[in-house]
Amino acid sequence: MRVLILAENEFEDLELFYPLYRLREEGLEVKVASSSLEVRVGKKGYQVRPDLTYEDVKVEDYAGLVIPGGKSPERVRINERAVEIVKDFLELGKPVAAICHGPQLLISAMAVKGRRMTSWIGIRDDLIAAGALYEDRPVVVDGNVITSRMPDDLPYFCGELIKILKRY
C-alpha cells in the first residue's frame, strides 16, 4: 500500500518526516511529490528529495494522502495539478490527512464546507469562512478527512490515519 505526501519548500519538518517514517514503520510505501524533483528544504533546514512531480502522480496508485503544514501548503495550493490531486483523492473516498496549515489545500479544493475540521489557529478563520465546522482538538476525523493542529498532535494524527488506512 502506498501513501503520497505533497510538499514544497518551508514545510514544517516534523509534520513531513514523522508521518513519513511512522507510515513506513507500518510497512507502507511513502512517496513525496512536489512541483519539481529539486531538493525541498523544511523550515528547520531538513531536506527531502521528491520522488516524483505532481504531473507524474497517478492517484489510483495511492491509498492515502498527507499534507504537512508550515509554509509549504501556500506554495502547493497555487499549483493547479496539486489541487486536482487533492480533489481526486477526496472524490475517490481515499483518506486525506492535513495538519497545521495543510487544510489550506482543502480550502483550495473547495472541500471544507460543512466538514468538521481543525488546523493551526492562524488559519482557523479561513476554514470557518470557507464553511468548515471548526473544532479546537488534537485531531478531527470527518469521513475520510483527518485534520490536526500542530506538531504536538502528530501521534494522534498518524494514529487516526493508520486506523483508516488499515480499513481501506
UniProtKB/Swiss-Prot annotation:
Domain (PfpI endopeptidase) ranges: 1-166
Disulfide bonds: none
Coiled coil: none
CDD domains: GATase1_PfpI_like (cd03134)
PROSITE patterns referenced in this protein's UniProt entry, alphabetically: PEPTIDASE_C56_PFPI
Family the entry assigns: Belongs to the peptidase C56 family.
PANTHER family: DJ-1 PROTEIN (PTHR42733), DJ-1_THIJ_PFPI FAMILY PROTEIN (PTHR42733:SF2)
Protein name: Uncharacterized protein AF_1281
